[in-house]
Amino acid sequence: MTSTLQTLAFKLAPPSREAGSGQLEPCSDVQGRRYEVVPSVVCSMCCLFGIIYCFFGYRCFKAVLFLTGLMFGSVIIFLLCYKERVLDTQLSVEASVGIGLGIGTLCGLVTMLVRSVGLFMVGLLLGLLVGIGTLIGMEELSSNPPRSVWVPLGVLLGLGMLFAVLTLQWQRCFTTLSTAVFGAAVIVVATDYFVELFALVRYIYERVKTGPREPVCWTTWVVLGAWPALALLGVLVQWRVTAEGYSHTKVMISRQQRRVQLMRIRQKEERRESSRKKKRKQPQSAQHTHAAKALHPEPAYRRKPNPIRRFDGDVLSPSYIQSFRDRQVDGRAYPVGGLMPSGHTSVDMDYDCGSTVPLTAGVGPHVRV
């Protein structure tokens, strides 16, 4: 692993200036190039990955978010661990790679699960690539390009943040554009190894560092010109073929609809079970009600008698009732049918006190009520 990384570092290192043989030197040393097995295999896999990323990026939306977070996290943590001292010790390349991959995997999971974070990283990647193209254009088109370190830093961060915000606003459009541009860049870098052993990568690295301008071979410009062409082709293919009729928002909505449908199905099943339980309980309750009716038969309906109509004269005072009792006591002293003093009437106490018969009568024979 260490020898492979050292080989890649040697390939990426700028050529020595001592043996300067003129401006055509970058194109002259073609026969002396030697290709290693491991870098060739890695570049071939990256080329295949770039093709999928360029032409099927938006279709593989979740995978794009995961790989973007994995790449950012792994590269940043690897550089920090390899260049800086951690706990007063210089970590080896293998340890730095392992730590970078571990933390990069966590970053990839975060960008995949939190969609807004993933879209922000996708837009940031697009802005960085556009910033690199801007720096190359400034270097070649300007007669006196700026050599300050803050210029590339400001261009990269400014364009990165701008495209990150735009990606959050127009998600489908800028996600398609970002995947096409990044996939084309990966294809170009992998091809550059087989053409010039990363001469284009060294040139871009010097432009970011604001280093002195060095002559490059015409094949470098051909490889660099393939980048925007492949990016445009990737956008067209995704727009018309691979991403047509597909939307990452519909995927989220369809999952929510599935959950809602499952909830509805569960509610229907619960209702059916509750109705079955009610039907089972109804015969038992009916039997209990019949038994209760047999034990406690309902009384027959009886019509309430009409209330007796009373008048003002029907109300008897307690004094009259007491006089009735006194007369009854007096009447027992005489035989039935005997004579009593005139002006009084013999009253039987079995008589209902609520009767409408007058209590006194005129002078005459005894009247038994």
Curated annotation (Swiss-Prot):
Task: Supply the alphabetized keyword list.
Answer: Membrane, Transmembrane, Transmembrane helix
Compartments where found: Membrane
Membrane disposition: Multi-pass membrane protein
Please tell me one Gene Ontology term that the record gives under cellular component. plasma membrane
- Residues passing through the membrane, by range: 37-57, 60-80, 93-113, 117-137, 148-168, 181-201, 216-236
Q: Which GO terms describe its biological process?
A: positive regulation of canonical Wnt signaling pathway
- The source's superkingdom equals Eukaryota
User: Which Pfam families does the entry link to?
Assistant: TM7S3_TM198
| Sequence segments annotated as region (Disordered) | 266-308
Q: What is its main location?
A: membrane
InterPro entries reported for this sequence: TM7S3/TM198-like_dom (IPR025256), TMEM198 (IPR040236)
Query: What family does the Swiss-Prot or TrEMBL record give for this protein?
Result: Belongs to the TMEM198 family.
According to UniProt, the name of this protein is Transmembrane protein 198
Please state the gene responsible for encoding this protein. Answer: tmem198ab
